[in-house]
Amino acid sequence: MTLMIERPCLRLMRRALAAASLAALAACTTPPPREQQPAFYRSLALAGARIDAESAAGMISAYRRNHGLPPVTVDPALQQEAEAEARRMAAADRPSSADAVKQRLAGAGIKAPAVNLSAGYHTMAEAFSGWRESPQHNRTMLAPGATRLGIATAYAPGSKYKVYWALILAGP
């Protein structure tokens, strides 16, 4: 009878040892890396979220090339203007007048400014799609003389829009 009692105990110990070994091995492996979400799908409806201006310029440049136009590059001065305009709109909780912004930019010596001001898009993909579908916004992205841009968003948590957008394109 002693042998019958020892066998089930031995089997139980083997199973416990196997389970412990598997658990130890599992603890040593690293989980697979999480896939990084492309910048154009990243939500900008969060505090501290910033648009990837270089990625946006690449997307707009590809669109322009498909229409026989030259690419655009991020310009630090236009980037600052876009950031300031996006913050102004978020603070006022309403989009600004594109004509007023264009006049201000032209008065500051910026050559042939074209401006998209909008609100409510949470990702670059949404904004780009919306701008392509809007004749006025599409004309801005396809401004023939544009060679540089600034693009920015500002988050307004209490606003129905949440995210305000400023895209400024200009000539050389």
Region roles according to the model:
Residues A23-L46:
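Bacterial Sec signal peptide processing site at the extreme N-terminus
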Residues M124-P172:
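Disulfide-stabilized extracellular recognition modules
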Residues L12-A16, R65, N138:
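Hydrophobic alpha-helical segments, especially transmembrane helices
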Residues E54, G58-A62, P76, Q80-R87, ...:
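Solvent-exposed, polar/charged alpha-helical surfaces in well-ordered, non-transmembrane soluble domains
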Residues R42-A53, R65-V74, R87-A91, P113-A119, ...:
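Second-shell loop/turn segments in exported
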Residues M1-C28:
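Sec-dependent bacterial lipoprotein signal peptides
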